[in-house]
Every structure is written in C-alpha cells, then in structure tokens.
C-alpha cells in the first residue's frame, strides 16, 4: 500500500474516533483503521455522492437515527422522536451533552445542537451547495421555494426549539422520511466550524516524498 493510502487510512481512523466521542461513548481512547481502495475526495456530508465519500461520511458522522444489526431504525444522536397523526410533523429530542471531538480525542467547544441540523438542511437547499440530497427531502415545507431562491431559508420547514428539540414540517406525507435521515445529507453541520474551515472538512494537501 502506498504512502497516500496509508495516510488516508490514518485520517479515517482518527476521524472515526471523532464520531464515537461525539456520540457520547466511553471516554476511553477508541480507534478504527479502515483501508480503502479509493481515496475519499469529499468529507462534506451535505454534498458527498461518490461511494468512497459516502462510506467515509457514514463512518465519520452520526445522524438522528441509524439502523441496528437487525436493520431496524433506532435513535442515534436523539433520545426519541414523535410523529404527528397526519404524518406531517416529526419532532426529535436530542441527547444532551453531545460534543464534536477533534482528532486524537482533542476536546472542542462545539456542542451538537438542534441548530446544527437546521443549518445542515439549509445547506442542502441552498442553491449554491448543489446538494444531491435536496430531492430526497423535497417533502419538507417550502423546500422547493428555498431551493429555487424564491423563499427565505428561514421559511424552510426545519426548526429548532431550544438546543435539543428539532422539528421537521412536511408539505406532504412521506412514509420513507424517517429512513432517509440516515443519509449523509441529514447529518449535523456546525455553522461556526464550517465557516472557519471554509468547508474543507479534513481534506489535506498531499505531497509525495
């Protein structure tokens, strides 16, 4: 394996530890080394589409829900969720005390809050993002108008009630909506961190020796 692949494996291993710590796991150091055939070129979950990028994002970030070993949808970063009787409102109650953790377990000041999910979905429907996940979540209220620039992003049917309560409002029923929340595009994005890194998301310059 060449040096480039080895370096990528190390980056993925360190970032995987970021996910485990962010999900409120044990304080003990945990690492996972995954050797890949193709180098991930994009670690931005709102735009990742290539198989290697999606696999990396699915292992780097946590979402509201995940599938367990039996294939059932279970809470991940949330404690629980509620669905209205008409199927148009989804309310998620996030776990408290979740934080993003840097490589090698370095602590950060970035807490995972409902606003991170709001910002993530606003990015999905920002025309400049050109997110492939916009079509998957087109049932969200005002998503089409926000995407085509005729409505303010603040009118998108994704809102935070306090730090730990996230609400989705749909314009039409979508019985697959919950399962779509395991997609990378639905994973949280801290606005301050994103702006500070200009969306580079761990990508690095490589110079061969």
For each predicted feature, which ranges?
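Sec-exported extracytoplasmic/periplasmic mature domains
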Residues: 65, 69, 96-99, 122-130, ...
């Amino acid at each position: 394996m060449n040096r480039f692949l080895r370096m990528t494996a190390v980056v993925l291993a360190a970032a995987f530890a970021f996910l485990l710590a962010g999900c409120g796991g044990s304080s003990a150091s945990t690492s996972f080394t995954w050797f890949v055939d193709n180098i991930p070129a994009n670690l931005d979950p709102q735009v990742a589409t290539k198989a290697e990028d999606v696999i990396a994002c699915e292992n780097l970030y946590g979402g509201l829900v995940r599938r367990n070993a039996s294939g059932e949808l279970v809470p991940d970063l949330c404690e629980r969720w509620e669905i209205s009787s008409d199927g148009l409102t989804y309310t998620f109650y996030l776990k408290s005390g979740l934080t993003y953790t840097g490589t090698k377990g370095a602590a950060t000041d970035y807490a995972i809050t409902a606003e991170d999910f709001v910002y993530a979905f606003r990015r999905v429907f920002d025309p400049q993002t050109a997110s492939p996940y916009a079509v998957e979540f087109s049932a969200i209220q005002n998503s089409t108008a926000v995407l085509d620039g005729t409505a303010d992003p603040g009118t998108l049917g994704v809102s935070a009630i306090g730090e730990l309560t996230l609400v989705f409002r749909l314009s039409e029923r979508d019985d697959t909506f919950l399962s779509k929340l395991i997609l990378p595009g639905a994973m949280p994005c801290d606005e301050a961190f994103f702006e500070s890194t200009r969306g580079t998301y761990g990508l690095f310059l490589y110079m061969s020796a």
